[in-house]
């Protein structure tokens, strides 16, 4: 196997939307970094039955809704 071609694999802390934390290993960030999730299995509509609203980060959702608002409307 070639040396120095694999990314650094280290421990990070993942912070869920409800504040719970767990330690896992990842190539993301640096050793000991915290990854704060905006959405997870406890808050994603696919796992909660679609009752929660989507977060509009940077206006992306509202731009999408504006662009495609009349897409499926029948005249």
Swiss-Prot record:
Pfam families: Ribosomal_L31. PANTHER family: 50S RIBOSOMAL PROTEIN L31, CHLOROPLASTIC, LARGE RIBOSOMAL SUBUNIT PROTEIN BL31A. This is Large ribosomal subunit protein bL31. InterPro entries: Ribosomal_bL28/bL31-like_sf, Ribosomal_bL31, Ribosomal_bL31_A, Ribosomal_bL31_sf. GO terms for cellular component: ribonucleoprotein complex; ribosome. The lineage of its organism: Bacteria, Pseudomonadati, Pseudomonadota, Alphaproteobacteria, Hyphomicrobiales. The keyword Ribosomal protein applies. Keywords: Ribonucleoprotein, Ribosomal protein, RNA-binding, rRNA-binding. SUPFAM superfamilies: L28p-like. PROSITE patterns: RIBOSOMAL_L31. One of its GO terms (biological process) is translation. Binds the 23S rRNA.
